[in-house]
Structure formats: structure tokens, C-alpha cells
Amino acid sequence: MEKRKDTKTTIVKSSETTKSWYVVDAAGKTLGRLSSEVAKILRGKHKVTYTPHVAMGDGVIVINAEKVRLTGAKKGQKIYRYYTGYISGMREIPFENMMARKPNYIIEHAIKGMMPRTRLGKKQLKSLRIVKGDSYETFESQKPILLDI
């Protein structure tokens, strides 16, 4: 048997990577499906040259954060919890209240749960921008590409 010559594994260095920015519209999209696709882009898994230990992911700008949706009865059942640090300080906020107060947090929380809990994961998460509304003029210098998910 002759050995194939195109089966070499390439390890990409961080200096060899290029970072591009994408705009994702969350209007009418399901929260989990949107979050998993965005997490994949942030990690760089959509690239052919994906290397797990290199921060090679792209940046993502999510617009229309307040128009994301949940399926089934989760709209009335989903609860966000946090602890204030004081005795009896456990706070619970239903999805609908959180959507009215902080729609950006809902998407950020979902994407953060899909990222690795390491230093690299935190670095990759810094490339995420979530915007309420459909205006992203503040990020025009990144020359973002509209991505349909």
C-alpha cells in the first residue's frame, strides 16, 4: 500500500490565524439553536484549520436580542437564579421579567454555558457582542459580514 501524501495534520499557530466578524440576527430564532451556532463560531470550529488549543475563533455581533424566542412552555417555566452573597440572598427571575430587563443577558448566559470553562474559553467569549435592537453602527470598523443562521 502506498502512503497518501495529503494526510498531514496541520497545527495552526495563533500568529497564522485571521479574525473576521459576523452579524447574526436573533429575531425569531430559537435561543438554544442560535446559541450553539454562535458558540461554534466563537470557538473557531467552523474553520477547516480548527486547532483546539489556539484562540482562532471569529467575532460575533448578535442583533435584535429582545426578539429571540423559546419553544414549548419554557417561556413560563424558565427561571434565572443568582446569589447576592447575603443570607437568604437567592434571587429568582422568570424568563419574561429577565427579557424585559436584560435581553442581552439571556443570550450571553446561553452561549456562555456552551463555551469551555477555561482561560481560552473566557478569551473567546470576549469576541461576543450582543445588541438590543437592529443597530450595529458602533461595530462598522470591524467590517462585519451578515450571517444567516
UniProtKB/Swiss-Prot annotation:
GO molecular function, a single term: mRNA binding
InterPro entries: Ribosomal_uL13, Ribosomal_uL13_bac-type, Ribosomal_uL13_sf
Keywords: Ribonucleoprotein, Ribosomal protein
Domain of life: Bacteria
GO cellular component, one term: cytosolic large ribosomal subunit
BP terms from Gene Ontology: negative regulation of translation; translation
Name of one Pfam family that matches: Ribosomal_L13
CDD domains, per the entry: Ribosomal_L13 (cd00392)
Gene3D superfamilies xrefs: Ribosomal protein L13
Biological role: This protein is one of the early assembly proteins of the 50S ribosomal subunit, although it is not seen to bind rRNA by itself. It is important during the early stages of 50S assembly.
Family, similarity comment: Belongs to the universal ribosomal protein uL13 family.
PANTHER family associated with the record: LARGE RIBOSOMAL SUBUNIT PROTEIN UL13M, RIBOSOMAL PROTEIN L13
Subunit and partners: Part of the 50S ribosomal subunit.
HAMAP family: Ribosomal_uL13
Name listed for the protein in its UniProt record: Large ribosomal subunit protein uL13
Gene: rplM
